[in-house]
Every structure is written in structure tokens, then in C-alpha cells.
Amino acid sequence: GDVGTNAVAIRGNAPQFTQWRLEGIEIPNPTHFADLAGLGGGFLSALSTQVIGNSDFYNGAFPAEYSNALSGVFDMHLRNGNNQKYEHAFQVGLMGIDLASEGPISKKRGSSYLVNYRFSTTSLASGNDINLKYQDLAFKLNFPTRKAGTFSIWGLGLIDRNKADVLERSEWETMGDRSSGYNKLDKLAGGLAHKYVLDENTYIRSSLSATYSKDRSLADLHTDDAIINVADIQNSRWNLVFNSYLNKKFSPRHTNRTGITITELKYDLDYKVSPYWGLNKPMEQISKGSGEST
């Protein structure tokens, strides 16, 4: 990657082949505007440093629990909120407003909450004419019990909007000057997790989670006489994931993890693109369909 993106290229692989995981499950790329770039790098992480806990990064030789990744794996976790006192944070930067809050739900039981919300300051400053707008929300609720283990509820969501307006006709020099477009990206992930400690070296963790992502892209080419639609792309994906494993630490150098992951996949896509941009040709159906798999 470079300083202008959130891309990570590993062993020459494109950033889109990196797997992102949160709270033990695979999630859509948690980066704003990630799917607008062909390489999948994105612009800004949707996970604020206010909420990130212990995380692992693998650039090869993945453990058996990781699949569906060609280059690397980011295995991230949300930290628990402070269960003793309330803390709040407010930050303003060039790219956005960051609001965070954490504290106890019940001091007696040790339960806590953590929530973080960000909103692009560029849209606040420029209203509806700004090209890039984004929002993201992340939270985690933690509920320890005396005998039944620890329950947690977590979630992550991001909303991206990108609008490219055509230049004034007097400024047209290239085909890009005569193009306009609109992109909308929505991503959600969340779940319920349970961890039960059997002894100081053994625990069982189970979770039921869901992820959702939807992309919509429109592009028009402006001529002296008309506006021609050259792209209309819609892509939606849903995943329902059940995961459970037993973790056993035999020694400081030997830990075994045995479990199962069941994923139900659903998709719905509709791709219409003009095959010859600039030649004023109508759009053609490139791909259309829906389905599911487990």
C-alpha cells in the first residue's frame, strides 16, 4: 500500500486477498470505501483505536482455523469497557469527529459497555456537495457471570457515500471530465459470543454471528446532446456464522484449538456495464443472479 490508502500488500498479493476477522469470524473489509478501489485497499479504517483490543496479524503459514485467505490475516478483537468507572472521549480531526464512551453496566456483576461513533467532518463543513461521506459505529457489551461463563454482544457498522460530479462543459478535455458517478457502500457485522472456562488452561468459546455488505455504483457519461448510463452495479452478500472451539494450553509452547465453523452464504448481484465507454454504447447485462450455500 501507500500513505494514501489503508492497503496492505503481502508477498505481492493484492490487498483484497487479505482476510479480516473480528471477534473470531470473517467480516467484510472494515475499511471505508474499500470496494471502490480495484485492489481493495480502502481509505480509512472503520475501527477506531478507542475500541481495538488484542489483535494478531499473520503474513503466512496460517493456523488451520484460518481459511479463505491468500495473502494475510488480520484477526482483531474489541476490548471490554471499563467495569469500574465511566470514561468518555471526544476528538475532532481533519477527517472526522470521534465519540467514545465506556463504563460499567453493573459494578456488582462486573458487566460493561463500550461504544464508539465517528462521522466525517467533511460532510458537516460542505453539506451535500462533498464527494466523500462516511460514518461508522462499533460497540461491545460484556456480561460475566459466576457459574455460566461470560457472554458478550458486539457489533460494527459503516456507511460510505461517494459522489463525483461532471465538470463544466467548457472544462472537458478527457473522458473523465465528462463522467459522473455515485457509490454507496453499507457493511454490518455483529454477534453473540459465550466463553466458558473449564480450568486455568482450558476454555470453550462459541458464537453466533452475522455479516452483511451491499455495494451500489452508478456511472454516467455526458455528451453534448445526452447523458448516457454506462454502469449500474449492485452487489449484496449475507453470511450467518456459527463457531465453536475448545482451547487447551498444554505448556507455554504448546496450545491446541479444536472446533467447528458453519457458514451460510447468500448473495444477490446485478452487473450492467457499457462495453465501450466513450463510444456511447448502451449498457449490457454482464452478470445477474442470486443464490446461497452452506
Regions found by a protein language model. Give the residues of each.
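Periplasmic N-terminal accessory/gating domains of Gram-negative outer-membrane beta-barrel systems
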Residues: 1-62, 73-79
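Transmembrane beta-barrel architecture of outer-membrane proteins
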Residues: 5, 42, 52, 69-71, ...
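Structural signature of outer-membrane beta-barrel domains
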Residues: 15, 25-27, 79, 95, ...
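Strand-connecting loop/turn motifs
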Residues: 17, 50, 83-85, 96, ...
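Short acidic, glycine/proline-rich loop/turn micro-motifs
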Residues: 31-34, 124-128, 165-167, 217-224, ...
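Extracytoplasmic loops and strand-loop junctions of Gram-negative outer membrane beta-barrel proteins
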Residues: 36-41, 57-58, 82-84, 122-125, ...
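Predominantly transmembrane beta-strands of Gram-negative outer membrane beta-barrel pores used
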Residues: 54-63, 71-79, 86-144, 152-156
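Face-selective signature of the C-terminal outer-membrane beta-barrel domain
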Residues: 142-160, 181-294
